[in-house]
Design a protein with these regions (language model features):
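OB-fold and OB-like single-stranded nucleic-acid-recognition modules
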Residues: 16-146
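Nuclease-adjacent, charged terminal/linker segments that flank catalytic cores
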Residues: 1-4, 19
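Sec-dependent N-terminal signal peptides
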Residues: 4-13
Length: 146
């Protein structure tokens, strides 16, 4: 219960504080934010939690074939700061394909984390045409895919 109270206080404080734009942060601050985000994902994995919204960045370690069963999804693996590998399933029926994504690319992202034993899945990396779910995105080489 104490942890829940502290987490609620943290969220309230974060919501009330003035957010700095990424451009205004110095390198040490950017590194601390990146580590903090990766730690959140590592914690979600350790606790086997799902359906939690995350923002982070990482390096593409493998590009997979598209999933074409049902809604089409572009798939690739990304390693985040804690060396955790995430499977991205980016809906290309609702959003543009991430163009020319390749091994070694650095991406930033916002999406929903789903636990799986291999590290986790990130989905909802696109807009929601019905507006019933938070919209996500993937940023590669300065271009945002949503």
């Amino acid at each position: 219960m104490k942890n829940l109270f502290l987490f609620a206080c943290f969220l309230l404080l974060a919501a009330c504080s003035k957010a700095e734009s990424p451009a205004s942060l110095d390198n040490a601050s950017k590194q601390a934010v990146a580590q903090s985000n990766a730690s959140v994902i590592a914690d979600l994995y350790a606790k086997k939690r799902s359906q939690v919204w995350v923002e982070d960045n990482g390096i593409v370690v493998k590009v997979l074939a598209d999933d074409v069963n049902g809604a089409r999804h572009q798939r690739f693996l990304v390693k985040v700061g804690t060396n955790q590998t995430l499977l991205f399933v980016h809906n290309i029926d609702l959003a543009a394909r991430v163009e020319n994504i390749k091994l070694g690319d650095h991406i930033a992202f916002s999406g929903e984390y789903i636990y799986n034993p291999k590290g986790g899945i990130i989905h909802w990396t696109h807009h929601n045409p019905q507006g019933k779910h938070k919209a996500g995105w993937i940023k590669l080489n300065g271009k945002i895919y949503e």
